[in-house]
Amino acid sequence: MTVAIKLAEAGYPVTVFEWKGKFGGLLQYGIPEFRLPKSFLERYQARMEEMGITIRTNTTIGSVLMIDELLRDGYSSIFIGTGAEKPRTLGLQGESLGNVLFGLNYLANPRGHKLGDTVAIIGMGNAAMDVARTALRNGSRHVTLYARSKNVTASSSEVSYTELDGAEFVFGMHIEKITDEGPVFRKAVFNEKDEIIGYEEEPVQIHADSTIISISQVPRRKLARTTEGLELTDRGLLEVDENYMTTRPGVFGAGDVVTGAKTVVHAVDGAKKAAAAMIRYMERDLTETN
């Protein structure tokens, strides 16, 4: 969104490819309505279209169309801002059970899932807080977040809001598997520095109508697999240089697909810098052509 607006303001014709049915990416499908009303995105889209920006929904780059085909068709520069929308799995028994969900999948369509009264959430990040608050707003009465250590990766304000909404927090719980009854943990043993030094032998079965895994998310690798010369880092992130250009000339990237899951503010900052770099690249290319 940010890159499209910056390029349009600079006078460039812009097309945005959205792989889902509604425009907005993570803002549309990963942030709850109570935090970001969908009407805001609708107004934003209308404003972008007024600026002359074309938005193509239900179009996946990397399967329906390829980056090479975009370059073939005359696009002077391409920006990849696909984010990190693939849920990270635990790799444990029970993740495929019918009463188990991943956080981002739930947030994309919370009213489409019947969680029941009791919900166990694995994770303590900002996304996990969104999941908990959304579940409470959609009828679940007992929502508990579980973490292995005593550290919380979510911001203190998000934790406070989640507590005010009625969620509970349990620390020192190492998940081993998930059953139809709910998650199974082993309690962690801490030393005086709150460091984990072991686990109790007896497993603890938690009874939950639904278990939601919300530990993190990572970028999908489809674009790298389908685009020659587009490389990833050891972490599976899009590799870019100091000007946000990828290893494929003319193709840029920023946001979670480059940094891993971070805040929207961080993604917007990177997008602004990437847009400026794209403009410099295209202006230089135009000068050399003339």
Segments predicted by a language model, with ranges:
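Active-site rim loops that border cofactor/substrate pockets in soluble metabolic enzymes
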Residues: 161, 180-195
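Feature captures the FAD/FMN-dependent oxidoreductase FAD-binding
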Residues: 42-93, 176-184, 210-212, 217-223
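Glycine-rich dinucleotide-binding loop and its adjacent helix/turn
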Residues: 46-64, 87-138, 232-243, 247
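Beta1-alpha1 glycine-rich phosphate/pyrophosphate-binding loop at the start
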Residues: 1-61, 88, 126-170, 177-178, ...
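Generic beta-strand/beta-sheet core signal
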Residues: 17-19, 58, 80-82, 95, ...
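A conserved FAD-binding loop/helix module that cradles the flavin
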Residues: 131, 257-286
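FAD-site-proximal beta/loop scaffold in flavoenzymes
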Residues: 96-116, 193, 198-261
